[in-house]
Amino acid sequence: MSRVSQARNLGKYFLLIDNMLVVLGFFVVFPLISIRFVDQMGWAAVMVGIALGLRQFIQQGLGIFGGAIADRFGAKPMIVTGMLMRAAGFATMGIAHEPWLLWFSCLLSGLGGTLFDPPRSALVVKLIRPQQRGRFFSLLMMQDSAGAVIGALLGSWLLQYDFRLVCATGAVLFVLCAAFNAWLLPAWKLSTVRTPVREGMTRVMRDKRFVTYVLTLAGYYMLAVQVMLMLPIMVNDVAGAPSAVKWMYAIEACLSLTLLYPIARWSEKHFRLEHRLMAGLLIMSLSMMPVGMVSGLQQLFTLICLFYIGSIIAEPARETLSASLADARARGSYMGFSRLGLAIGGAIGYIGGGWLFDLGKSAHQPELPWMMLGIIGIFTFLALGWQFSQKRTARRLLERDA
């Protein structure tokens, strides 16, 4: 085995271990934020939505800067610093008794993610061969799902005692992850050239096809982020107990572990990436619309199952498309900018979703936010279809293994 192949194989194992620690640290805390502050402390959903949206927008919206800096200085210092900053954000969240302090903790958490997320994504593009990326992204998603349910179970158990224990556990996990990276991560360069920060950002902004694709995905993310805000609140309302939220993540884990990799392997042989992305988005949109009309937990979990199946189909295709469009001369900048759709869609999804949830509740129209989200998903589906049908983008966007 050549030294390059050996480095790639070792890099895969490193990425998987690192990803599991990050996912556990995140899901111990974040799925329970809406339960803690809306259900237990009686805050308006829009207040929590602002906090979650702020974290999302800062982490993903500023990702191009984090990626460009990582292109210049390397992945390791950015990743370690960002993870320590997120640990500080979680520690602050544990003592948040006023909205401004929750917002500040989410600000710290988001800034930390801005530093570590783009270089971690760029490492995947660097270490995984193009023809293997779709399957590796599927493995990461399976790991995400397993880590999500383990983290949510642990967080739900700790919440019975004290929310400060929840936040402390998340902070400790990110400190461990920072130490793991500081100790074992080599000083890898992300790009094929040592790209100046401004040049990497300029290269991305001039790539109109990539920019259009990323911004179009904002509608997709408006739906996807509801697993952190409105779906946990809905499960709690229908079940009457916060402990039921863990079953939502258990469903995701079971579906991902059993279906994600087989679906990815089968669909990559029979369907183009853009068709998989659009099919998954359509299923997610249609499953959202009836959520506000259900009154039983079984019906709600059935719709959540459909939503997760749509995500299982769409997400590996979306990740692979983003990676295939990245310029090797500025990988960090490209992967950072690819998060802008999540920044915009996530912020609108959290803040707008929280506002619509409160509005629907006060107007006795609980179906309002869910119908609106479904309609947004349909419009995004049509916008992606228009974009993929353009001859000027066909050669790049329809390339499965570029």
Swiss-Prot record:
A GO term from the CC aspect: plasma membrane
One annotated GO molecular function: transmembrane transporter activity
Cytoplasmic topology ranges: 1-12, 117-138, 186-213, 265-276, 321-339, 389-402
Residues on Periplasmic side: 34-98, 160-164, 235-243, 298-299, 361-367
Topology in membrane: Multi-pass membrane protein
Record keywords: Antibiotic resistance, Cell inner membrane, Cell membrane, Membrane, Transmembrane, Transmembrane helix, Transport
Membrane-spanning segments: 13-33, 99-116, 139-159, 165-185, 214-234, 244-264, 277-297, 300-320, 340-360, 368-388
Domain of life of the source: Bacteria
Pfam short name (any one): MFS_1
GO biological process, one term: response to antibiotic
Localization of this protein: Cell inner membrane
Family matches, as PANTHER family: MULTIDRUG RESISTANCE PROTEIN MDTH, RESISTANCE PROTEIN MDTM, PUTATIVE-RELATED-RELATED
Role noted for this protein: Confers resistance to norfloxacin and enoxacin.
Family: Belongs to the major facilitator superfamily. DHA1 family. MdtH (TC 2.A.1.2.21) subfamily.
Protein name per the record: Multidrug resistance protein MdtH
Species, as recorded: Escherichia coli (strain SMS-3-5 / SECEC)
Gene: mdtH
